[in-house]
Amino acid sequence: MGLLSLAIWTPILFGVALLAFGRDENAKVVRWVALIGALAGLLATVPLYDAFQLGTPAMQFVEKAPWIERFNVYYHLGLDGISFWFVPLTAFITVVVVIAGWEVITERVSQYFGAFLILSGLMIGVFCALDGILFYVFFEATLIPMYLIIGIWGGPNRIYAAFKFFLYTLLGSLLMLVALIWLYVKSGGSFDILAWHKLPIDGTAQTLLFFAFFAAFAVKVPMWPVHTWLPDVHVEAPTGGSAVLAAIMLKLGAYGFLRFSMPIAPDAAREWADLMIVLSLVAVIYVGLVAMVQQDMKKLVAYSSVAHMGFVTLGFFIFNDLGVAGGLVQMIAHGFVSGAMFLCIGVLYDRVHSREIASYGGVINTMPKFAAFALLFAMANCGLPATAGFVGEWMVILGAVKANFWLGLAAATALIFGAAYTLWMFKRVYLGPVANDDVRTLTDINAREFLMLTLLAIAVLYMGIFPFPFTQIMDTSVAELLKHVAVSKLN
């Protein structure tokens, strides 16, 4: 078994094994098996870093075996600098989420942790797939465990939220399936994504392909105006579900733009870049303003995610090295920061059972250790230098200035909104006098919560202070992508 197969199937097999346990039996054993499975999945990604060769844009760790031979469908995996970091990020967040749900989940424990481990493997599969059908299978299969996580362990309106999540993302993907089949026919019967990158395609077909992929990926990111499912889903999802959704699942859509939309339809991508930039700026500015008026902490952070992902798509479609690399760095940083923000909300919700900002105030007086972590993650969400939230956004702004000064100015101005809604929430929840009896009786974080938040704090600070390892791996692949996109496919 190759290294990528090991990274994909280790958590999936542990997840399937967990499903064999009884509904609420052996909960203690289940938790330990889940943690061992998550750690094994993370350890399986370590050799990838050691063996990754810098300076080459070629796919590495390639595995290829026949799957459905009649239609030339292959189990074809590979990693390059663009996709590399999302594999260990997914495995890392899975470990954190297992720790987060350790004491909180008391019903259907084996199914809960099993669903998360299976979801982890499927998401890694999306980032590794080099066959169109294999990508589609992994991409769509991620909906099933997340649908169950929201629908079973979510809030009072969980069924509505689960259906909305499932239908929005599934309907968007149907057009992508049509595009994949068209490319299969056009290429003479191949689902090889890398072969599709070299396929000559006329202008009209490129435009249709671009918008077919846009339908699938824009909903997943989500971009404005197809973002409306995200706040509803975050509000109802359990804490672990929100953390994984924000930290990893939103990245599947953004990754799709780099693997499909831009290299397969480069002329259409350049032609419609202005539209993508406008939609991205609307997400950053307008959705940032919407976040400022939210009274529900989860909704505020959900809208914050839409705004931060707007920086990602903005970076991609300004078509320069700083923009694309900055977008990728922002994706990784957002994985750490947004996951941490949702887990902090979960810590409070487990104690007070309210997500309303008005229910809190003065939390720093009763939970000083927790408030210190919350302050760090809030500063990272604002884009404070020396935190992970700063690096990607700064690179995107520099890339935007390089492309057009006024575009860069608009992007930089939008950072003000991020600071405004984050600091407004922090002030009302953590500072000031103790608001009510619920807050007055709060206990500070326990050892499990301290470990969970410490892991994320280390990641946020390390990436903010020393981002070079992250950018070093992606630079060559980003340069190759931009070189490819700059060449017209029109005859």
Features from the language model and the residues they span:
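Transmembrane helix-loop-helix hairpins at membrane boundaries of multipass inner-membrane proteins
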Residues: 2-3, 17-114, 190, 194-198, ...
